[in-house]
Amino acid sequence: MRFCLMVTGPAYGSQHASSAWLFARELLAQGHSVESVFFYREGVLNASELTAPASDEVDMTRNWQQLHQQHGVALNVCVAAALRRGVSDKQEAANLGLAAANLAEGFQLTGLGALAEAALSCDRLVQF
């Protein structure tokens, strides 16, 4: 089956992101495909390259990046939700006159259209 995930919780402070990541790993291990992850609301904070967890903590941003690199999972970040929460790529930072960009490598800013496309193209859309 083809799955798409939506993550609405931050990398830290809730179980949303870690549960979604563990679910994605298990799906892949079972032979399913994970087409994309859409980060929405507080979930966009998973895409910040400025997180610095302690060495004995899970680095959720890095985990998502590895999922992207190893399995080609698209990491889509809602642009409106991201900008509200201080997450920006270089292009948006330049357009808005922001001092810096902090979107982690492998993530891409997209609109809600990416979520709609995922809902249409996948067999299951699972929200965390």
UniProtKB/Swiss-Prot annotation:
It is found in: Cytoplasm. GO terms for cellular component: sulfurtransferase complex. It comes from the Bacteria. GO terms for biological process: tRNA wobble position uridine thiolation. It is an enzyme of class 2 (transferase). The active site is at 78 (cysteine persulfide intermediate). The keyword Transcription does not apply. Keywords: Cytoplasm, Transferase, tRNA processing. Coiled coil: none annotated. Its main location: cytoplasm. GO terms for molecular function: sulfur carrier activity; sulfurtransferase activity. Pfam families: DsrE. Its EC number is 2.8.1.-. Heterohexamer, formed by a dimer of trimers. The hexameric TusBCD complex contains 2 copies each of TusB, TusC and TusD. The TusBCD complex interacts with TusE. Part of a sulfur-relay system required for 2-thiolation of 5-methylaminomethyl-2-thiouridine (mnm(5)s(2)U) at tRNA wobble positions. Accepts sulfur from TusA and transfers it in turn to TusE. Belongs to the DsrE/TusD family. This is Sulfurtransferase TusD. It comes from Erwinia tasmaniensis (strain DSM 17950 / CFBP 7177 / CIP 109463 / NCPPB 4357 / Et1/99).
